[in-house]
């Protein structure tokens, strides 16, 4: 191993660096035509009409792994497939952070699972708030670097585009963080909404920064949220460690099959068209919302959603709810006491949302 690889593995908990994990029946490379090694049923379930569900699934299906690597621009051995990005977050925290010792750094207001996983691991949580100014929310890069160095954080989570605020971090700023924290922390960039963004993916930076980790998912742009397929893209040696910490059979066969179909050339073509439509609708919706008298601010977004501040967020939420429109209440989040997050829907759905909010304006106070 080279010095860089040693540095990456040095960030893993010492007792897990040589941890063998569980050796499942499917993890052993064997061939044969009569499989009696996993105590599976010799008969299919009556509900299994195609008789394909009685065997345990591949832990990391090679075909899907190759398809995801091609999609994200990396090598198959740099991809760990898991149950959504949530599993990747949890695996990283458990593999890297010693309880009560190794901090996790987050940038609120932000996706809550980073903090949840840190708390479950009893890892100290360092919070560096996003800055809200005339241009919108943005990451405070100098403060992130200072806090990470001072606290000796082992994991730095950067959500880009950020949920719920919609801001993406420029690649140059992420590279500055990577350069400064080399050898001391894994820098995890969550690109769950990357397909909707003008900012390119950071995956190519992995060639220069082995302590970079990227999270991707099929839940958003690819419309496969129920399939629960997420990817951790990282140094191959780190991926191998995370795999040994993962459950033996994390990926149900039906989910793998749907994911493979969803990544076909034809499906990817449709996805690209829908992403373009969502981006266009996002800007239409943003402009229309900004014209409503009860709206204080509509933030620019690189995701498939908009963060909106209201004069009376409770009234807006309740009016939408009464009309059958459910949006995400963000008022409990730091800095967002008056904000709702609105997912960009179809043109018809967005028009319906706007109609309800316009009706609020028409009602006398």
From Swiss-Prot:
UniProt keyword annotation of Amino-acid biosynthesis present: yes
GO BP of this protein: L-histidine biosynthetic process
Enzyme class (EC, first level): transferase
Keyword set, alphabetical order: Amino-acid biosynthesis, Aminotransferase, Histidine biosynthesis, Pyridoxal phosphate, Transferase
Domain of life the protein comes from: Bacteria
Cross-referenced InterPro entries: Aminotransferase_I/II_large (IPR004839), HisP_aminotrans (IPR005861), PyrdxlP-dep_Trfase (IPR015424), PyrdxlP-dep_Trfase_major (IPR015421), PyrdxlP-dep_Trfase_small (IPR015422)
Pfam families registered for this protein in UniProt: Aminotran_1_2
Similarity-based family: Belongs to the class-II pyridoxal-phosphate-dependent aminotransferase family. Histidinol-phosphate aminotransferase subfamily.
Entries under NCBIfam families matching the protein: hisC
PANTHER family given in the database record: HISTIDINOL-PHOSPHATE AMINOTRANSFERASE, HISTIDINOL-PHOSPHATE AMINOTRANSFERASE-RELATED
Subunit structure: Homodimer.
Protein name according to UniProt: Histidinol-phosphate aminotransferase
Phylogenetic lineage: Bacteria, Pseudomonadati, Pseudomonadota, Gammaproteobacteria, Lysobacterales
